[in-house]
Each structure stands twice: as C-alpha cells, then as structure tokens.
Amino acid sequence: MKSFVAKPSTIERKWYVIDATDMVVGRLASEVAKRLRGKHKPTYTPFMDCGDNIIIVNAEKVRFTGNKRNDKVYYWHSRFPGGLKSITADKELSGNHPERVLEKAIKGMLPKNVLGRQMFRKLNVYKGSEHPHTAQQPEELKLG
C-alpha cells in the first residue's frame, strides 16, 4: 500500500473561530499552531500547507500562568547602535496591539521557512469580539 500524499486540489480548508477569553497563551498557541499546520487531519502531508483558517477573537483577554505576565519580556533591535528595545507582556496586552502576544507565540511554533510563513497568513487575530470574516461562516471551536 502506498503512502497518501495530499495534492493542492484535494486539500479542504475550514474556517474556525476561537474565543480566547481566559485561555492560557501557550496552550492556545500550541493547539492553533497544530491546526494551522494541518496535523489534526488524517491527510496531513509535511511538505504541503493543509491546515485550516483560524480566527481568534478577544485576544486581549488571554492569561498567563504564574508571574509571566510581568516577567515575560519581548526584545527586538532597531539595528542602530544601542538600539535594543524591550516590552513586557503586561504592557503589550494593555497597549494598542494586544493581539501581537498571541501572534508571536503562534509564529514561534510554526516552521521557520516559506511554508511556515504561508501557514501564518491563515491566522487572523482580533482584540475585540467582532471580526470581518462572517461571510466565510466559521465554525466555533472549543479548546480545552
């Protein structure tokens, strides 16, 4: 018996919406990354993008375990001398773009190549309870 290999014409993608209220960041991110890759499907093929489209709402209401909300620090560099910048998870969540916390966590769990960037494009994270993807008729996905 030959191994199954998914073709682009046979891949079926569904739309799911997840309410992130009171969900732990890492546990939510690992489940979403698995679904973006398509590893929950029996037709999973490692070199094909066979995952689903995910919409996450209420991204500002996620929670961290322990004291990570104050201790976790995100770093980046401006590429100028002395340009190391940082922000804590608490400031990021209470700032203008709280959805970036979830995006960074999920992006770190995807492959670091062209396929991973293609998978990441199927993720839509919003800070409120509204999203503009009602035309796709997403299914509610309960995690945990």
From Swiss-Prot:
Name the domain of life this protein comes from: Bacteria
Organism encoding this protein = Magnetococcus marinus (strain ATCC BAA-1437 / JCM 17883 / MC-1)
What is the annotated role of this protein in its UniProt record?
Answer: This protein is one of the early assembly proteins of the 50S ribosomal subunit, although it is not seen to bind rRNA by itself. It is important during the early stages of 50S assembly.
Quaternary structure, per UniProt, is: Part of the 50S ribosomal subunit.
Which GO CC annotations does the UniProt entry carry?
A: cytosolic large ribosomal subunit
What are the record keywords, sorted?
Ribonucleoprotein, Ribosomal protein
Question: Which cysteines in this chain are paired by disulphide bridges?
Answer: none
Q: Which GO terms describe its molecular function?
A: mRNA binding; structural constituent of ribosome
Family, according to the entry, reads as follows: Belongs to the universal ribosomal protein uL13 family.
Please report the name of this protein according to its UniProt entry. Answer: Large ribosomal subunit protein uL13
Q: Mind listing the GO biological process terms from this record?
A: negative regulation of translation; translation
Q: Which InterPro entries match?
A: Ribosomal_uL13 (IPR005822), Ribosomal_uL13_bac-type (IPR005823), Ribosomal_uL13_CS (IPR023563), Ribosomal_uL13_sf (IPR036899)
